[in-house]
């Protein structure tokens, strides 16, 4: 739950580190720092708060030429210890021999810290990361090891999913990089090597990337990468190129990345449709999927956060179009509450970042428990992610690339709708192979899908100003419930999550019929009830649930494309969405709810791109 950057090259590392930290800031952070080697000394600069404070501190204390050609940087999201300067990375050992940045969690740090403390080590911070430099220094001193040996010895004692980058005072031309189930990417340029937890930090400087493997120690210098694994050094040539167009972004004329990304959706979904639909009336394999369609008898979807809500919509779509059971599980729950092992099951792992810690663990467990089973229990693994170079794509046999471009805003917007559309396209592809829909029916669905970007564009042009006005009227609301049925339940849960994330208003989402089974006890004057409704989802009972809340003082807001006088008689406010098919309407409804949440947060003066206490990429379990 942090960002890592490292650089060793011919010029000063200052700009690479600072610019890299800036680009990593979208992942969420509460403090930042850098360490660099100059004149046989490791210098560390850290600060709490925004990276601008760190820049000021660096500029106040060092001229650019005073910052050497090797350094590491870090944006921290507090998991162990409060968000303070003393807890910020990088961390040093007592003698200043080693500086370390770390991402992830060291599970046995308490035991190691106690052991080192008993043996005379004094710790300054409350973090798990500070154990690493002290342990390396201890091993080097007491076991009389060389630097590389001491680092390897220390790393062998650390338990958990983490990555770490280390510089050593007495090896001022090398950076040590190590990962275990928390990814690091190396960048190769002209006369330099770099490392980061996300390629976005490296793209201004290189197009060539190298993925480190788990439990490998990489040593990078100006011109060379060496990998130490199983007792020997190798010099690998494995490389990949990231899609730079997907990684480069700016706010353009928008006030925030989040608002820009809401507006990006018409283009994102159009691109996803074009890349998936091969011709006018067929579904393209596009080289992405080669599933054994007819063998699939069950689905299980694993996801977290907004991806989980997209999975709930996906469940309804898949069951509706393919008529096969679909089970949806939280990634965080899957590993501790394993569901029954079902035969002929396609497991779909959904993750925006492709680096979610709970998701990666869940996939490993699913693969492991099916490994030695009868062939009917063979693991069919498919991922849906926005980063086709991420860890999740390496752990699944097949992957669907959302092609949404990088999403800077912490709250998911375009990736949520792209995930939902991906489920729809996947369902049609499976329906075509399993003959659960006639060709004519599939073509009708495809025609509706092709109209979706136009419907979203229409909504953004016609309705944004009215949604903005409505948000201003309702900004003092302190409690909110979202309700919907079927396809709209996932949209309701996602709408509630969006409002909660960026406006900090307490809200929850429920199945419309469930509000009377407990939640209505919380309804009082000025409680806002947002109802997502359409004629095909038991409109009358949804209206009845809304009216029951209104009788207890609630303010009612409807998201709908229904043209009916009963809507105006029942609801206090209405957000109209374009008339479109039921499945596509669940996506356009989500865009309306994103705009509503955005402007509620806007009128509260919140930092919408970086809401409090949230991180974009949750790499810890």
UniProtKB/Swiss-Prot annotation:
It catalyses: D-fructose 6-phosphate + L-glutamine = D-glucosamine 6-phosphate + L-glutamate. GO terms for cellular component: chloroplast; cytosol. Keywords: Aminotransferase, Chloroplast, Glutamine amidotransferase, Plastid, Repeat, Transferase. It is found in: Plastid, Chloroplast. GO terms for molecular function: carbohydrate derivative binding; glutamine-fructose-6-phosphate transaminase (isomerizing) activity. Its EC number is 2.6.1.16. It comes from the Eukaryota. Residues 2-223 form the Glutamine amidotransferase type-2 domain. The active site is at residues 2, 616. One of its GO terms (biological process) is protein N-linked glycosylation. Pfam families: GATase_6, SIS. PROSITE patterns: GATASE_TYPE_2, SIS. Residues 289-436, 470-611 form the SIS domain. PANTHER family: GLUCOSAMINE--FRUCTOSE-6-PHOSPHATE AMINOTRANSFERASE, ISOMERIZING (PTHR10937), GLUTAMINE--FRUCTOSE-6-PHOSPHATE TRANSAMINASE (ISOMERIZING) (PTHR10937:SF0). Catalyzes the first step in hexosamine metabolism, converting fructose-6P into glucosamine-6P using glutamine as a nitrogen source. Homodimer. This is Glutamine--fructose-6-phosphate aminotransferase [isomerizing]. It comes from Cyanidium caldarium. The lineage of its organism: Eukaryota, Rhodophyta, Bangiophyceae, Cyanidiales, Cyanidiaceae. The gene is glmS.
